[in-house]
């Protein structure tokens, strides 16, 4: 009889303790850094620096061309950013990042020689150019350190840089009067190694930072190769003004240096976008 009473008591206590244990195991969801979902949208106002050198199939190296200084593209054009983070377990999370920026211009009267391989543009006649980029990044992170005040995480990611660029104008040499039309349309899949650190000053104020970097060489298929490196970094402050809505201010850097070989033509491209981001964040 005593054994039966003890057994019933034991299982009753065990059953009663389950909700408490379950609640305790998920206490991290109430931490300032413990949001299951966080979706952010911001306005990115970067300084833009885009350069290219094209080497033709004969090995003739063209001039270094700045899209902003030599071709007239805007050097400070804003765009939107989208961030989505999902913490599916306490120490495991996946993220998605997106931005796009399209620019075009027509210029004439350049003060420097502009050449694609051995083809030299007539700089006294109009030269049309465009540089469009769409970036998608997906990543996974694991929290090495995660408590009520701070989080240190590492992870891996893949940044898909969809590039489309072109320069069109009239040739001055070696074939005066002919039209030069040099374009590139390619997607650069650049993997990254990531590290980040977040710190909660209080329940409403958080410091957030993230760095992604990697250098890579890839064979993209017949007559197409890619090598390059990417730096993707940001740091800033998140203010959780309301229970599920916050506002953030951060500094963002995209620095990509890639060499494309497309049908024997080498495009060496370096683009550097850096500046402030202001946005709103929804968490739940």
Predicted regions and their residues:
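Cleavable N-terminal export/targeting peptides
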Residues: 1-35
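Short glycine/proline- and aromatic-enriched beta-strand/turn motifs that initiate or cap beta-hairpins
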Residues: 22-101, 136, 281-283
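Repeated loop/turn-to-beta-strand initiation elements of outer-membrane beta-barrel proteins
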Residues: 91-94, 148-150, 203-207, 243-247
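Mid-length scaffold segments of soluble, non-membrane domains
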Residues: 187-191, 201
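Surface-exposed extracellular loop regions of Gram-negative outer-membrane beta-barrel proteins
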Residues: 198-215
């Amino acid at each position: 009889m005593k054994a039966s009473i003890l057994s019933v008591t034991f299982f009753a206590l065990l059953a009663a303790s389950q909700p408490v244990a379950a609640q305790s195991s998920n206490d991290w969801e109430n931490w300032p850094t413990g949001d299951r979902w966080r979706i952010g949208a911001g306005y990115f106002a970067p300084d833009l620096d885009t350069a290219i050198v094209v080497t033709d199939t004969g090995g003739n190296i063209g001039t270094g061309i700045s899209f902003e200084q030599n071709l007239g593209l805007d050097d400070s054009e804003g765009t939107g950013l989208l961030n989505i983070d999902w913490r599916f377990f306490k120490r495991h999370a996946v993220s998605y990042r997106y931005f796009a920026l399209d620019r075009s211009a027509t210029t004439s009267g350049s003060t420097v020689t502009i050449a694609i391989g051995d083809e030299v543009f007539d700089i006294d006649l109009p030269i049309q150019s465009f540089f469009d980029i769409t970036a998608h990044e997906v990543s996974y992170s694991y929290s090495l350190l995660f408590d009520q005040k701070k989080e240190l995480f590492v992870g891996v990611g893949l940044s898909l840089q969809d590039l489309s660029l072109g320069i069109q104008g009239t040739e001055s040499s070696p074939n005066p009067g002919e039209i030069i039309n040099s374009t590139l349309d390619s997607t650069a899949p650049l993997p990254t190694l990531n590290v980040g650190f977040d710190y909660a000053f209080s329940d409403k104020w958080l410091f957030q930072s993230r760095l992604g970097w990697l250098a890579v060489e890839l064979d993209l298929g017949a007559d197409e190769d890619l090598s390059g490196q990417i730096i993707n970094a940001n740091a800033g402050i998140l203010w959780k003004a309301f229970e599920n809505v916050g506002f953030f201010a951060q500094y963002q850097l995209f620095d990509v240096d890639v060499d494309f070989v497309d049908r024997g033509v080498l495009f060496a491209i370096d683009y550097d976008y850096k500046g402030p981001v202001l946005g709103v964040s929804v968490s739940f």
